[in-house]
Amino acid sequence: MMVDNLNVSREVTHALLNYQNLLLKWNKAINLISRNSEKDLWERHILDSLQLLKYIDFSDIIIDMGSGGGFPGIVLSICGVKNTVLIESDKKKSVFLAQASKLSSNKIIIVDERIDEKFNMNCDILTSRGFSSVTNILGVTEGIKIQKKMLLLKGKNYEKEITEAQKHWVFDFNLHNSITSGEGKIVEIFNIKKLL
């Protein structure tokens, strides 16, 4: 199960297994993850989310954009992040997230509405996985005051997305190798300003 080298406790591993079982049960009724990725759930989804722990303090307030099946937000909360806000406009997925949030002993707030640049909230870190392009994420989160950084789990098109975003935004960024994808990166974005 590849969680040993991430210093995840037995209790957390047990909660993640319960989360996996709940997700697979719900996935029969609503599309939380691709049916093809069910067999690779730990590697493709849970471990992919767990790798963000390296860049997060448990005391950070996290906003997870487009939480869907709970990646990475639910996983981070189960692992110890004290305050997590999950943003998911799909009502069925929000109901699933409410059920999954019971597996965490930490505070989770679910916002089940579509957000735009007028949405007003504060956080330390904004996370996103498979939600949208870097440009779109920067646009819809314009009203969110991010104290530290964004952590975006991106696939092979990350360079193209960053280049496109730089046409509209000025920001600093770091690229971190993904432990689950040779082509993907964790894109860390900070000091964000919109070009006039």
Language-model segments: which ranges?
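Hydrophobic beta-strand segment of the Class I
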Residues: L126-S128
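Residue-level signal for inorganic ion chemistry
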Residues: L23, L76, K154
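Conserved beta-strand signature within the Rossmann-like core of class I S-adenosyl-L-methionine
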Residues: Q147-E159
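A short glycine-rich, Lys/Arg-flanked "PGG" loop and its adjoining helix->strand segment in the class I
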Residues: L138-M150
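Conserved SAM/SAH cofactor-binding pocket of Class I
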Residues: L50-N122
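Class I SAM-dependent transferase core
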Residues: M1-S59, I63, K92-N106
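Non-DNA-binding regulatory cores of transcription-related proteins
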Residues: D112-E113, T135-I137, T141, K156
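Active-site capping/gating segments
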Residues: K82-V85, N157-L196
